[in-house]
Amino acid sequence: MSELLIDNISMRFDLPNGSSVQALKDVTLSLKSGELLSVLGPSGCGKTTLLNIVAGFLAPTAGQITLDGNRVTGPSAERGMVFQQGALFEWMSVRENVGFGPRMKGPLNAETREKVDHLLDVVGLQDFKEKAVYELSGGMQQRVALARCLANEPDVILMDEPLGALDALTREKMQSLVLKLWKETGKTIILITHSVEEALLLGERLLVMAPRPGRIHKEYRLPFADLGVNQDLREVKKHPDYAKTREEILAMIWDMEEEIMGRQETA
């Protein structure tokens, strides 16, 4: 059982003019193996900065990240990343993209090829495996990105607004796919999003972050992700607590945005 511990993380960025920005302050959080966490908040609350620290792309100013007791000091195959733009090799085929990580560890054997084909089947791309990535739609490219991440067998999957650029219908289908993969693989997932609805549907735990400095403002434990594994997401939205929680969070973020605007006007 892998456990991710975010221990009292702070992050300060120094600016060229000699000033600095406190992006995160005293963020502490623990995730057990298989948890699905969504992180939400207004622009400037540090949610992407936090994800980049967990990924090992940034070193925090203070505090530490550990996975199974081992300190995170840089990127690792134990933590897979899915970006808003798929960051795929567009000239390669779908199958070559998904198999890229395993191939970096050595020649693909029959077992690994079978795993790649299984992942393509899971994300619904078996019929497109020989297509070049540039021939695919945005939604299909994000399916490739998910499969490629899973092919590396990470303990933790980090998702930085992976569905933000998709149209509404494709986004809903991808949300259902994320829930399916979460339940089938048992992976720990951290998902960053600007969408309140997405955060509610794709988080059994949901963090609302506040800005300047970025910090955890409130945490929710929600039933909607578990419900969405076996139900149409449009049906999940009819749950009596869904609309209530949605309005509560929208009001919370609206107040944060208003406070930011007020500071700017008086500065």
Regions of interest found by a model, annotated:
Residues 20, 75, 95, 121, ...:
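Signature (C-motif/LSGGQ) region and adjacent switch/coupling loops
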Residues 40-42:
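The feature captures the beta-strand-to-loop junction immediately N-terminal to the Walker
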Residues 55:
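Helix-to-loop junction immediately C-terminal to a conserved catalytic motif
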Residues 63-75:
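Conserved ABC transporter NBD signature motif
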Residues 95-103, 113, 117, 221:
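Short helical segment in ABC ATPase nucleotide-binding domains corresponding to the A-loop/adjacent helical element
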Residues 110-128, 180:
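Conserved ABC ATPase "signature" region
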Residues 131-134, 152:
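Conserved signature/switch motifs of ABC ATPase nucleotide-binding domains
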Residues 146:
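Hydrophobic anchor residue at the start of the ABC signature
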